[in-house]
Amino acid sequence: MKSIKLNNKLVGDTEPCYFIAEIGSLFKNFEEAKRLIDSAVEIGINAVKFQTFEAETITTKNNFFNMKNTGKISQYELFKKCEISKELQMEVTNYANKKGITIFSAPSHI
């Protein structure tokens, strides 16, 4: 496989392992996101990834989980709690860039 370059780091079969930390939507504010990014930088992670979605685009308000341990919360309510605003995404992206770590997002729906 041919190597590719991600933010000045070669990635490929003959290159050192490229580590990506999944931070998903595990943060609710900028301070929590900074802590996660700082931890990733401290242990030598190459990139962090979060998730971009809006509850309205992936479920309905009347859609419930089909599992016993989820209680009575709807999928919409749960996903709504996990949304990350565009403003917070920009703050987090700017901070990651300043810290020198690659950041990207996995969009749920386009």
Each language-model region and where it sits:
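N-terminal amphipathic alpha-helix/helix-capping segment at the start of soluble metabolic enzymes
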Residues: 1-20, 89
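Short, acidic/polar
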Residues: 29-40, 108-110
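Active-site beta->alpha loop and helix N-cap motifs at the rims of alpha/beta catalytic domains
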Residues: 69-110
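Active-site beta-loop-alpha junctions enriched in small/polar residues
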Residues: 24-26, 51-55, 108-110
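Hydrophobic faces of well-ordered beta-strands that scaffold small-molecule active sites
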Residues: 19-23, 48-50, 103-105
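Glycine-rich, proline-tolerant flexible connector loops at the mouths of alpha/beta enzymes
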Residues: 46-83
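A structural motif
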Residues: 44-45, 101
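Acidic (Asp/Glu)-rich catalytic clusters
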Residues: 11-12, 41, 94-98
